[in-house]
Regions:
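Hydrophobic alpha-helical connector segments
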Residues: 68, 82-109
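Helix-turn-helix
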Residues: 31-64, 68
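Karyopherin-beta/Importin-beta family HEAT-repeat alpha-solenoid scaffold
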Residues: 25, 42, 172, 181-185
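Alpha-helical DNA-contacting segments of helix-turn-helix folds
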Residues: 63-76, 118
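Amphipathic alpha-helical segments used for helix-helix packing
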Residues: 98-125, 155-159
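Basic, helix-initiating cap at the start of DNA-binding domains
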Residues: 1-35, 43-47
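Amphipathic alpha-helical packing segments from all-alpha helical-bundle domains
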Residues: 119-147, 173, 177
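Amphipathic C-terminal alpha-helical segment
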Residues: 146, 150-169, 181-185
Length: 185
């Protein structure tokens, strides 16, 4: 799991505390996915059976809860991308970009509505940093070209997903065209 800097929540060190932390996240995800989304520490305490001070120990605000969920899902997405890259074993950057776009689109669609939290500024930076390092290790393109390609991918997929709640095959194809056109020119 990538280390995140400047996060607003406190990751526990002890196993017992980690279980409480995970329970809070699980409950927060459940509430977030409800139709009448209103994520509050009071509701989490009520549903999870944990005391509010225990929750505030890890999450000083509602925003810190959302950030923790965002980081969790961003890390799951990054792990999935890395697994797909390893299983394919391509050294061709264009092919890796196509796989990257497909994996992100599938993850977003399969994990909605929680997946919209991947588009927080913090998560987008985490995604770009991790993928830049990964693609730089196998690519013959310069770092700036890859960095901007990742920005194109994230912007296109974010636009499509936030507008529609899913990503159509046409939007995936257009994202690939835009990114690959930039990359090769």
């Amino acid at each position: 799991m990538p280390i995140t800097k400047n996060q607003s929540f406190i990751k526990p060190k002890q196993e017992r505390s980690q279980k409480r932390f995970d329970e809070v996240i699980k409950t927060a995800e459940f509430i977030y996915m409800s139709d009448d989304y209103d994520l509050t520490v009071q509701d989490i305490a009520k549903i999870s059976g944990l005391k509010r001070p225990s929750i505030y120990k890890f999450f000083p605000s509602n925003e810190s809860l959302l950030e923790a969920i965002s980081v969790k899902h961003t890390n799951k997405l990054l792990l999935l991308i890395k697994k797909n890259f390893k299983s394919v074993n391509y050294k061709n950057t264009s092919e890796l970009i196509k796989i990257l776009i497909d994996v992100i689109a599938i993850y977003l669609t399969n994990n909605s509505p929680l997946s919209n939290l991947i588009f927080t500024d913090h998560s987008k930076k985490l995604i770009k940093d991790e993928l830049l390092e990964l693609l730089n290790s196998v690519s013959n393109y310069n770092e700036l070209k890859i960095k901007y390609s990742l920005s194109i991918i994230i912007s296109c997929l974010e636009e499509a997903f936030m507008k529609e709640g899913n990503i159509s095959p046409q939007q995936i194809a257009e994202t690939k065209k835009a990114c690959l056109h930039y990359l090769v020119n």
